[in-house]
Regions:
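Surface-exposed binding/hinge segments that line
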Residues: 213-256, 270-275, 280
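Detector for C-terminal structural segments
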Residues: 48, 58, 358, 362-396, ...
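Ligand-site clamp/hinge motif
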Residues: 288-328
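A bilobed periplasmic-binding-protein/Venus flytrap-type ligand-binding module shared by bacterial periplasmic
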Residues: 284-287, 332-358, 362, 371
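Aromatic- and charge-enriched surface segment that lines or borders ligand/interaction sites
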Residues: 18-21, 43, 140-142, 147, ...
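Ligand/substrate-recognition segments at binding pockets and active sites
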Residues: 19-28, 33-39, 51, 55-57, ...
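N-terminal lobe/hinge region of extracytoplasmic solute-binding protein
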Residues: 125-175
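A structural "hinge/loop" feature
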Residues: 130-144, 239-245, 540-561
Length: 570
């Protein structure tokens, strides 16, 4: 796009000669640009190569040459700003636009969405943070969990109705409640070309044995080619459904020791990682996928932390507010989860009953929603939660328990994830409310991986967290409960045993339904968790009618492998 000096020279040339209909002299241009004749010719050649001008030099000294402008300085700077936006250099782009944030936002919105590039169908999406933790066992946030579904496969999977169906395994059978057999599709390969082997499956599940959900796996064996047997230490009539969880996706044996695997994972799924920088994540279609090859060739997720999510008007994004719900038609749905406060009743102040009652009664969803109304996140489609999942009403009609105000000057520690648009605002609102009672709140933003470290988290008194099942299947609650031990670390041992007993009872019989209602009620009634908000999710029908089959999944995204772009036919 030319050097800064060349652009300055072009601007000077354009200002002087734009309305000149007669010929120009090379000597006059040289004087204007303060260059020698030789350097002036080089400058004009570069401008011509950039397609800013048409330069037809005359032959012979003193004769007039023809200078024609085919671009303007504004167009040059606009084009350069677009290029910098593509590269994620928003600060440079804003400077080129003379600090005009509206112009910057327009350029960003124009660059995003659906496009055709070199015969390929490309979808570009904005996101407010980097996506570098894509290993299934570490995917603690829901956007990472969505991407894991695009990059990896499990032995089984849940469909949109929440029913279990085959994935890497095409059939399975329960030989006994402690012996399950899975039949594997042949010739499945990872993105790097390596064939999926028994050892990959075995090592994936042996690495998960510290998780309560998979702790009863006694051994994994292969009695014959493309057959996998699981021997369990206790009866489990629902084992096949458990294998559909996001953290049970199959990874290669090399992933367990590869240092950068979380950022550059290799799976078997419909999309593979082709780039994952601080500015951009690019997924490209897996040409050798064992299922249906995706119709979208490439998905780019741009990291745009400087731009508030509510300002981005992209039709492929989750609805960010109620102001245009009419345009979302029947595609609007409620997130299958909620934002919540998790109280540390094990090592935090909430282990004291009076503190527990005080915090759960003075911090209310309505109070926090009112504070959000006055912030930049006003209108993001949140509403009061009466239970952990939409439809549950465990918070209603609960008796108010009397409490004594804690001592003035007492300190409460609140933890939450870094790079979250809501949590700092909610933390500020909680701080202001507790200050009315003389209580000091100290907030602690955590890096995502630090959330998994018990040593770093045990001093936190309460957590701002969020959960989403991502499916209609209630068993998905197991991933939230056990994948990262967050709930266990904050729950008294005797209470957590009650939850595990409910699950043991469920898996002991094929007739038992998953106790999602009982578990959620127990967590709310014990004041372990205070549900805060549910959220609306949807795909706009207005912004881009060429995208087909785009519906919002349970993790707030649309499934990349199922959408396609309808071509325009004249």
């Amino acid at each position: 796009m030319g050097s800064p000096r060349l652009r300055t020279q072009f601007e000077k040339l354009y200002t002087h000669y734009n309305n000149n209909d007669s010929g120009v002299q090379i000597d006059d241009i040289a004087d204007l640009l303060c260059c020698t004749r030789r350097n002036t010719r080089m400058v004009l050649k570069k401008m011509s190569d950039e397609k800013w001008i048409i330069w037809n030099p005359a032959v012979g000294r003193g004769k007039s040459s023809i200078l024609e402008f085919i671009s303007t300085p504004d167009a040059v700077y606009l084009s350069l700003a677009r290029q910098n936006i593509e590269e994620g250099k928003l600060d440079v782009a804003l400077e080129l636009l003379d600090g005009n944030q509206d112009a910057l936002l327009d350029l960003i919105n124009n660059a995003l969405g659906v496009s055709h590039e070199k015969g390929k169908q490309v979808v570009k999406l904005p996101y407010y943070r980097q996506l570098h933790i894509l290993k299934p066992s570490l995917a603690i946030r829901r956007s990472e969990q969505h991407l894991v579904q695009q990059i990896f496969n499990g032995l089984t999977q849940w469909n949109k109705a929440g029913d279990i169906e085959g994935d890497i395994a095409h059939h399975w059978e329960m030989l006994s409640p402690t012996h399950w057999r899975f039949y594997i599709r042949p010739s499945i390969s990872f993105h790097d070309g390596k064939l999926l082997a028994f050892e990959d499956i075995k090592e994936t599940f042996l690495a998960l044995k510290s998780n309560f959900v998979f702790a009863h796996i006694h051994s994994v064996s292969s009695p014959s080619l493309n057959i996998i047997d699981f021997a369990l230490s206790k009866s489990d009539h629902h084992f096949a459904s458990k294998l559909a969880q996001f953290n049970a996706k199959i990874i290669p044996t090399t992933a367990h020791t590869q240092q950068d695997y979380s950022r550059y994972p290799v799976g078997t799924g419909p999309y593979k990682i082709s780039e994952n920088t601080d500015k951009k994540l690019i997924l490209t279609a897996n040409e050798h996928y064992f299922g249906y090859r995706p119709l979208i060739d490439s998905v780019e997720v741009w990291t745009l932390p400087e731009v508030a999510p509510i300002q981005l008007k992209l039709g492929l994004e989750v609805s960010e507010g109620p102001e245009s719900y009419s345009s979302y038609g029947e595609k609007v749905d409620v997130d299958k989860g909620c934002s919540y406060l998790l109280f540390n009743r094990k090592t935090g102040v909430a282990k004291d009953k009076n503190w527990q009652v005080y915090l759960s009664q003075v911090i209310t969803p309505l109070m926090l929603l009112n504070e959000l109304q006055n912030s930049q996140m006003n209108g993001i489609g949140l509403f009061n939660a009466y239970g952990l999942l939409p439809g549950l009403q465990h918070c209603l009609n609960r008796a108010k328990v009397p409490f004594t105000l804690p001592s003035k000057g007492s300190v409460v520690h609140l933890g939450y994830e870094k790079e979250h648009p809501l949590y700092p605002l909610l933390g500020k609102a909680i701080e202001q409310r507790l200050a009315l009672d003389g209580i000091v709140l100290k907030t602690h933003p955590f890096d995502t991986l630090d959330l998994l470290c018990e040593e770093k988290t045990q001093s936190i008194d309460m957590w701002l967290r969020g959960m989403s099942l991502g499916t209609q299947c209630p068993e998905a609650l197991l991933s939230w409960l056990f994948a990262f031990n967050e709930i266990e670390r904050a729950t008294p041992e005797e209470d957590f045993i009650q939850i595990t007993m409910l699950i043991d009872n469920w898996q002991s019989s094929p007739e038992n339904h998953f106790p999602v209602n009982e578990i959620c009620r127990y967590l709310v009634n014990s004041d372990q968790i205070l549900p805060l908000f549910h959220g609306w999710m949807g795909i706009s029908e207005n912004a881009n009618n060429s995208i087909q089959n785009a519906s919002c999944n349970g993790l707030g995204w649309f499934d990349f492998e199922t959408v396609w772009i309808k071509p325009e036919i004249n």
